[in-house]
Amino acid sequence: MKLLYFAWIRVKMGTSNESVDPPSTVENVQSLIDWMTRRNSVSSETFSDLTTIRIAVNQEYVDLDYPIKPGDEIAFFPPVTGG
């Protein structure tokens, strides 16, 4: 599974992407984030307020209950605003 980080999320995570192999109990976006936040304090801080983060799986916007599987590409980025 490939994770992509953009904008301030990339800065906080210290990388633009990483490949991970979460346990089989990780079945949707929310359980992936829960697993990620238990890995280290950086992830825990970065994903502490999910209202400031949008998520896409395989380049489609999704909700937290969206199912995921090995081989998926999951992107995390701030909401885009215009003006």
Regions found by a protein language model. Give the residues of each.
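Ubiquitin-like/PB1-type beta-grasp interaction modules and other compact soluble beta-rich domains
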Residues: 1-82
